[in-house]
């Protein structure tokens, strides 16, 4: 995992997840830490809408699960095996789509369909299908490739910041 190959937004999400795990005294950055940080951000709101995921409800589920993680006093925090594997899966997907930078969306989708309990619960609760979610992400991108560190900021920018001038 190379931080220089991550979008600026993903770098921020990762740092926020590390800080969240530390503040919650988790022994490692786990799927719940990554998902909580992603759900607190607005970068994927368009994807959540497309796949029918209620961000508020999902955030509640993740926070409840986070309370069940054992506490640790370690100051040297690493990524859990599930999160590492999710980053690898996301990188593979990004490579298949000729992308230079790893995005929050590709990591989110890999996290969503990893083997963690919370991921399985989210998939079950919101009746999510892996192929449909990846297809929704490709549609959201509308053919855009993530080839600069801030490419992610431009996806759905018109919808987010634009207004009808007519």
Task: Enumerate the predicted regions with their spans.
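Histone-fold recognition with a strong bias for associated Lys/Arg-rich disordered tails
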Residues: 1-166
């Amino acid at each position: 995992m190379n931080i220089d190959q991550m979008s600026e937004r993903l770098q921020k999400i990762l740092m926020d997840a590390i800080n969240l795990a530390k503040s919650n005294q988790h022994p490692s950055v786990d799927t719940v830490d990554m998902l909580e940080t992603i759900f607190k951000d607005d970068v994927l709101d368009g994807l959540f809408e497309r796949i029918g995921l209620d961000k508020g409800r999902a955030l509640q589920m993740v926070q409840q699960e986070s309370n069940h993680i054992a506490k640790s006093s370690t100051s040297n925090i690493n990524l859990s095996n599930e999160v590492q594997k999710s980053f690898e899966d996301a990188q593979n997907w990004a490579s298949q789509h000729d992308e230079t930078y790893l995005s929050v969306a590709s990591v989110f989708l890999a996290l969503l369909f990893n083997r963690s309990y919370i991921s399985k619960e989210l998939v079950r609760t919101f009746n999510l299908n892996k192929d449909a979610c990846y297809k929704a992400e490709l549609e959201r991108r509308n053919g855009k490739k993530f080839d600069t560190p801030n490419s992610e900021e431009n996806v759905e920018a018109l919808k987010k910041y634009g207004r009808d001038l007519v």
